[in-house]
Structure formats: C-alpha cells, structure tokens
Amino acid sequence: MNRKVIDLQSNLFKLLTLRTSIQLESFPHIKVFLSEEDYDSVRRDVTLVVQLRFGRDQIACIYEYVGENYLVLPSEFEEIKIPSLEAAPDLVPIQFIHLITNQIEPTDKASEGVLLEYVFVDPAIEFVQWEDIHKYFPLFTMFKINDTLPEDEKEKLNFLKRLCIESVCQNNSLLQLPFDNDTLTSYSSIASSIDNNIPYDNVLRSLLSYHWKFCFIDLYRCQERLLMLAWVDEFKNTMNSSLPINELYNAMKSRYNTEHHEDENMRSLYRLLPQNILDIMTKASRPDTKANYIYKLRNRIVHFQHSDADIETMKDDEWNMIVRFVLESIPYLYNKLQNYIIELPEV
C-alpha cells in the first residue's frame, strides 16, 4: 500500500477513536476497504484547492478531482440552489480526504462500546467497509462547481466566501438574528458582487453574528476602509486637480500634516451614494445626517457607556433597515472608488 494512503488510513482511525481509550496498536492490520479506483484516486487525484471555516464547526472546501471542482459543505446545506452549483454524488475519495484534512471529529455515536462492537470486532480484523466508518462522522453534502475557478489564490478564497454567504442566506439554520427577507436579499446581492476588494469575511461574519451591534460593526468595517479614499476623491473633484491620485494624496498629507477625520470623511463617503440607496435609511433625511447617524452609532457601540444602553433595546425592524442600508452601499462604493483602491492600496 502506498505510504500516503497508509498515513491517511492511520489518521482516519485516530480520528474515529479520538474520544475513546481504544488502543490502535491492538489492531495492527485494520484498514478501510477501498476499491482499486478509489484507492488510486485517494493516492493521486484529490487536491484541496481552498478551505474556509465559518460558523461553529462549519467547514467549506473546494477540491479538484479528475479535472472537475467540487464544493463540500455540511449536510444542512443540501437543498441550496446556486446557479454555479449542481448536486454531485458522494465521491468516496473526496469524503475520505475531507475528513482527514480538516480533522473532523466523530459524532457522539462513536462511543467506545459501539466501536468495539461494530468496527474493532477482532484484533485480527483487516478490512472495514467505508460505509461502516463514514456513518460515525458528521454528514456533508457535495456539489460540482460549473464555473471556472479564478487563478489567483485570494480570488479563489473570495469565490468560496461568496458561495458560503449565499448558502447561509438560503439555509437559515445558522442564522441567529431575525433578518427580514429584504436584508437577506441584500446579503445575496453582495455575494453576487464579484469585487475582490470587498472584505467578504466581514460580510460573512456579520451574517453569522449573534447580536445586531456586532453584525453592524463588521459591515461598518467594510465602509471604514473607504473613508480616506472618499476624502481624497472629494478634494480632487473640489479642487479640479489633475495630479495623479497617489501624488495628490501625498501632497494632501504633507500639506495638512494630520490624519483624516472619520466623521467628516463619512459624510464625504455618503455623498457618493445614489438616492435609491440613501432612501433605504429613513433615520435621517440628507446624506450628511445619515452619515452622522451611522458614525455616531459606531462610536456608541465601540465606546459603550451606560448611557448608551438603549442600543440593546433597538427593534429588529430598525436594525434590519440599518444593516440593509450599509449592505447595499458596500458594492456601490467599492465600485465607485475602485481606482483609488488600486492607486492607494495601503490607505
């Protein structure tokens, strides 16, 4: 048997007996029976492309297998419908690699007594069927990816993050906040925005948050990155400057010798928004007052005082409106300021 497969087999049985006192040395010949085709595939045909841990004990992975790409998700996502995905059969080589690569622990069914009765039945045992092992681990579901994966590693990870955002939107078992349908639609929309400058990890964390204020803060961080850029954009347009963006920024920093003021730059940022996005937020009438409200809310959460306790009693409808407003603004603003992001990547 190939050394790689021997090591994988050993690691699988170590996982299976993780919460028991079973000594694997007492079963020196035990191994999972694999067909010749599956054996060869485990040995050479399965490649982990990218992985992402999200939520509690939730793992998403993309594998390349025999020239195709497959997405593996926990079983609760079995019913999701995403255009780029199609349901795939359970491919044993991918299942085998997925369990071991991600060190997925067995379920409570893998008690010592059960394993001794049905798996480790005799010290001389040699082969155990894959089905008799796999059933003691959490179930997962598999999809074939019909889209071509990006070449860039960061873009591959963002591709997976966007799939996870859309998957969570379609399966509310992981959601802890009462998002309304409009808000979930906004999350789905941002998952469809192919912009590798957008911090999709913040978007995914906000979707999985257990409190509205943490959901909001993660989305605010997506806007926060753009504040200085909005300041440069407004200055450039006001002064009708022909300087290249990076030269203008350096000249501004040198001339004013000061860091930007977030409250002012939040107003500059929101002045870029179109009316249909501004209309989502009914807490204030003008872009500047909307910016002031969002910035003040951020400060009240980050620098929480007893006088800010009313944040804890804000209604779900109000939070849905705020979250949806910020969500809808993110892809628009990142697209609007994309040249500044390219020219000033460290700002």
Stretches with model-predicted labels:
Residues 2-18, 180-347:
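Amphipathic, oligomerization/interface secondary-structure segments
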Residues 2-201, 205-210, 316-347:
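Charged, non-catalytic interaction/linker regions at domain boundaries
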